[in-house]
Amino acid sequence: MAIDLQQDYFSLFGMPRRFRIDESALEAAWHGLQGEVHPDRFAHLPDVEKRRSMQWATRVNEGFRVLRKPLSRAQYLLELAGVDAAIDTNTAMSPEFLMEQMEWREAVEEARAAGEVDELEQLHLRLRQHSREVHAGLADALDDAGDYPAAAETVRRLMFIEKLQHEIDDALEALEN
């Protein structure tokens, strides 16, 4: 078996180039490819073949890691479309979103400072629901509208949301210990 190391991850796994994917089919394709390219299958072959199998296995695992998570999958789709989401440099967000983030952060900090585990758990649930809504908007922007600038902004929003979810998790862990 030979893997084209130049093909995109969607092609590698036989998936359509879309944000909405069948995650079970992705996992099944990953397991199938892993079985074909696993370095143990090439242990008896010359070093050049062993190295090639390591490259293939690395490519398969990296592709799965990227496509498995919605946020990295969206970033990858933007990259394939030639859109720079400017994740590291463009943090400009709408005033409404920034105000919303400030409110979320204040609520988390107040609950943390007061030691209110129940309130933090409620905030986590509300934020998870909000994240689902934003993901749905991202799917619409990428798959239905092909609106890459909106998708790039939504990716940046999701990064804020994901970071806040981790902060809530950390606060809960600190309070429960």
From Swiss-Prot:
Domain J, chain residue ranges per copy: 8-80
Keyword Chaperone attached: yes
Gene Ontology biological-process annotations: [2Fe-2S] cluster assembly; protein complex oligomerization; protein folding
GO molecular function: ATPase activator activity; protein-folding chaperone binding
Keywords: Chaperone
Subunit structure, interactors included: Interacts with HscA and stimulates its ATPase activity.
Family, similarity comment: Belongs to the HscB family.
Function: Co-chaperone involved in the maturation of iron-sulfur cluster-containing proteins. Seems to help targeting proteins to be folded toward HscA.
Protein name: Co-chaperone protein HscB homolog
Organism: Azoarcus sp. (strain BH72)
